[in-house]
Structure formats: C-alpha cells, structure tokens
Amino acid sequence: MARKEFRYRGYTLEQLMNMSLEELARLFPARQRRSLKRGLTPEQKKLLRKIRLAKKGKYKKPIRTHCRDMIILPEMVGLTIYVHNGKEFVPVEIKPEMIGHYLGEFAPTRKKVEHGAPGVGATRSSMFVAVK
C-alpha cells in the first residue's frame, strides 16, 4: 500500500516551504501563532540562521541548541537538531509531522523513575527476613 502524502491543514510540504512566516503563522494553533506574531527571540534567530546554513551545506557541525521554545518550521524538516534537556543534548530528527510543535516537546526533561528492589527493613515484615 502506498504511503499517504503528508499534508498540514491541507497544504503539502512544498507549499508550506514556499510560504512566508506570516502566512505560515495563520495555519498554526493560537499559542504558536501568538508566539510568531511577537517575533523571534535573538536565540531563535541564531538557530534559524544555523539551520539555513546547514540546509545549504555550509554549516558542518551538528546543530545544538538550548532553545526549546522554537517552533518547528517546514524549513527544518530533514535535519537533526540536538536539543538540551537540562543535562545533555538529545538528538531530534525533524519529520514533517512535527511542524507546528515546539522543539522541547521532543526532548523530555524528566526521566521515568525506575525503582530497585526494596531493602531489608523497608517494611515491617521484612525485618525478620534473613539477610543473604
């Protein structure tokens, strides 16, 4: 079965790539639309500049950023961006389905707790269990 072509609100990826930031903002949900309407922060502009250089092949290093509040735009599709999660940089491969989301959504800041076995004396009944 053929894979269905990606569309965002009825527009193909090529059409989204040709849109200006203002036209694109109209398609996004309210939170992202308001964020783009206020303008990009200097950190976001710097990241966008690196992304554009990487697309042209002029930026060789991996793109690393602390800018978790950057909205994923169509021009980022296909790149791998390393997003900081508070401890390390997590690689995030940008796919078309991620357009309109924030970078931080794909780099979780909290780890799932993995408890070990309870120790001796952890409960009242384990006080009388022989220690190995």
Curated annotation (Swiss-Prot):
Coiled coil residues, start to end: none
Gene Ontology biological process terms from the UniProt entry: ribosomal small subunit assembly; translation
A Gene Ontology molecular function term of the record: rRNA binding
GO cellular component: cytosolic small ribosomal subunit
InterPro entries listed in its UniProt record: Ribosomal_uS19 (IPR002222), Ribosomal_uS19_CS (IPR020934), Ribosomal_uS19_euk/arc (IPR005713), Ribosomal_uS19_SF (IPR023575)
Tagged with keyword Transport: no
Alphabetical UniProt keywords: Ribonucleoprotein, Ribosomal protein, RNA-binding, rRNA-binding
Pfam families per UniProt: Ribosomal_S19 (PF00203)
Family of this protein: Belongs to the universal ribosomal protein uS19 family.
Role: Protein S19 forms a complex with S13 that binds strongly to the 16S ribosomal RNA.
HAMAP family according to UniProt: Ribosomal_uS19 (MF_00531)
Protein name: Small ribosomal subunit protein uS19
Source organism of the structure: Pyrococcus furiosus (strain ATCC 43587 / DSM 3638 / JCM 8422 / Vc1)
